[in-house]
Amino acid sequence: MLLVIDVGNSNIVLGIYDGDSLVRDWRVSTDKSKTTDEYGILVHELFRLAGIDFSRITDIIISSVVPTLTGVLEKLSLQYFDFKPYVVGPGIKTGMSIHYDNPKEVGADRIVNAVAGYEKHHTALIIVDFGTATTFDYVNKRGEYCGGAIAPGLMISMEALFQKASKLPRVEITKPPAIVAKNTVNSMQAGIFYGYVGLVDGIVTRMKGEGKENPKVIATGGLAGLIAPESTTIEEVDEYLTLEGLRILYQRNRES
């Protein structure tokens, strides 16, 4: 079995693959203060509750945008599983040309998503990933990563509004009853929610105009399911795109 780990700024998503099949997945909060042993205990407990024995894991692949945790999880693999993990970054074969001024600057999660998206669809793509930051990535018809855009995520936008406007409360991110809201909470929700839908559709539309390939637009990430139904540009939500990308990269590097 393969353990895939996607480390984001807000959440860590773990998945277990048996061959090509995702058999279990978990989402936990990212905690930069946790030690290798603390993460080891967490993983052990998740496995125990799922009835999965550590000995069944034969390989691990990690994608991380939190450098301090990359080393922590590499050590976890060595200490608790007795082997070195694959880590997405320099030296990992992606099978994809990266057209970026400095390819090393591209977040590991963005490359993983691009690889998975093209492997599944084999056409030009715009991938929208709703994370701590929302990323927009363009893959052309030849399967080359062409770059993209980065915007503040929904949670960052809401927190900024709460922190900078002293009379406004912290509210839940959800679709409000109406865009013409009748109270402060719904007004904030309307501004954030519909403003974000407009941001997504605006950036995607401009990317489509620049690329001129009529790309398919897919979304992933924790809040994709909230925004996608109101978007006029998102065609598909793929909840497990990043985990699939890690599985694909593992297979490409294991076989090479």
UniProtKB/Swiss-Prot annotation:
A monovalent cation. Ammonium or potassium. Keywords: ATP-binding, Coenzyme A biosynthesis, Cytoplasm, Kinase, Metal-binding, Nucleotide-binding, Potassium, Transferase. Homodimer. It catalyses: (R)-pantothenate + ATP = (R)-4'-phosphopantothenate + ADP + H(+). Its main location: cytoplasm. K(+) binds at residue 129. The gene is coaX. Its EC number is 2.7.1.33. Pathway: Cofactor biosynthesis; coenzyme A biosynthesis; CoA from (R)-pantothenate: step 1/5. Catalyzes the phosphorylation of pantothenate (Pan), the first step in CoA biosynthesis. This is Type III pantothenate kinase. It comes from the Bacteria. It is found in: Cytoplasm. InterPro entries: ATPase_NBD, Type_III_PanK. Substrate binds at residues 100, 107-110, 184.
